[in-house]
Amino acid sequence: MDPTISSLSTESTTLNKTGHPSCRPILTLSFLVPIITLLGLAGNTIVLWLLGFRMRRKAISVYVLNLSLADSFFLCCHFIDSLMRIMNFYGIYAHKLSKEILGNAAIIPYISGLSILSAISTERCLSVLWPIWYHCHRPRNMSAIICVLIWVLSFLMGILDWFFSGFLGETHHHLWKNVDFIVTAFLIFLFMLLFGSSLALLVRILCGSRRKPLSRLYVTISLTVMVYLICGLPLGLYLFLLYWFGIHLHYPFCHIYQVTVLLSCVNSSANPIIYFLVGSFRHRKKHRSLKMVLKRALEETPEEDEYTDSHVQKPTEISERRC
């Protein structure tokens, strides 16, 4: 599962081995990607600095911290990848091994980002559907433990995919296909988990017998999931089609890969913008620090009770007493 290598090696005026016209990467997209990635890295760096050093750690902040770390990792990979595309376009040599390592490294933050987003959505769904059970049985450091497991699993899948595709791809092709199948199946499972938990949460909040007032945290999560479905999911779908249907990266599919990468970079860059927009919406104070804005974006306080906290504290206290 390494479309980066193949798409970097295409030519514009020749025919490939299958007789299809090859194509060079679109130079406009190759220049857009580094611009978007630099902006996204700036935003995610601010989020990492605030959550890592300036704010008190909570369950949701641990998830958001790791999500920003995954987004930064993903943006770094594709920033370097875009520079290699530009170098390749102008005939500057780039070592094949660096392309192989970079192509497989990019799958690690993609898996971890989707996993963390699925974990956030699932936890919020459980807290809304079964609030008392959730507050009573949730381990104190569960978010940190889940994030560690996600990173370990993501690195394991990425390393195995790189090892079998780079070193044993020709001699042990069946093992490479098995690893790709596991990665693809895991991505499908994560997407179904994200979609199912988000849909259940949406139905419960908007259509339940007891409607829960919207909190800023729910708006933040909903917008993040929506942006992922629009911008982040196409890359996963492309990898799915690449594995199951054997789509080759000659004309015109090499352009599809570039577009999906650009959209995924937009997705990773948009998350900090979502946090700061939600946190600054209807803020009464004129002078707002980034720390306060980010803190408000992750608050579970409903909009109408934001300044009183009367309707939020009571259910939480009751559930904790029942534990």
Swiss-Prot record:
Purpose of the protein: Orphan receptor activated by neuropeptides terminating in Arg-Phe or Arg-Phe-amide. Mediates its action by association with G proteins that activate a phosphatidylinositol-calcium second messenger system. Its effect is mediated by G(q) and G(11) proteins. May regulate the function of nociceptive neurons by modulation of pain perception.
Family stated for the protein in its record: Belongs to the G-protein coupled receptor 1 family. Mas subfamily.
Q: Which residues cross the membrane?
A: 31-51, 60-80, 101-121, 144-164, 181-201, 227-247, 259-279
Chain ranges sitting on the Cytoplasmic side read 52-59, 122-143, 202-226, 280-323
**Pfam families in the record, alphabetically?**
7tm_1
Which keywords fit this entry according to its UniProt record? Cell membrane, G-protein coupled receptor, Glycoprotein, Membrane, Receptor, Transducer, Transmembrane, Transmembrane helix
Q: In which tissues is it expressed?
A: Uniquely localized in a subset of small dorsal root and trigeminal sensory neurons. Associated preferentially with IB4 class of small-diameter somatosensory afferents (also known as nociceptors).
Q: Where in the cell is it found?
A: Cell membrane
Q: Which GO terms describe its biological process?
A: chemosensory behavior; G protein-coupled receptor signaling pathway; hematopoietic progenitor cell differentiation
Which classification does the entry list for the species?
Eukaryota, Metazoa, Chordata, Craniata, Vertebrata
Residues on Extracellular side:
1-30, 81-100, 165-180, 248-258
| Name the record gives this protein | Mas-related G-protein coupled receptor member X1
What is the superkingdom listed in this entry's lineage? Eukaryota
Chain positions carrying an annotated carbohydrate: 16
Q: How does it sit in the membrane?
A: Multi-pass membrane protein
Q: Can you cite an annotated GO cellular component?
A: plasma membrane
Q: What PROSITE patterns does the record point to?
A: G_PROTEIN_RECEP_F1_1, G_PROTEIN_RECEP_F1_2
The molecular function GO annotations come to: G protein-coupled receptor activity
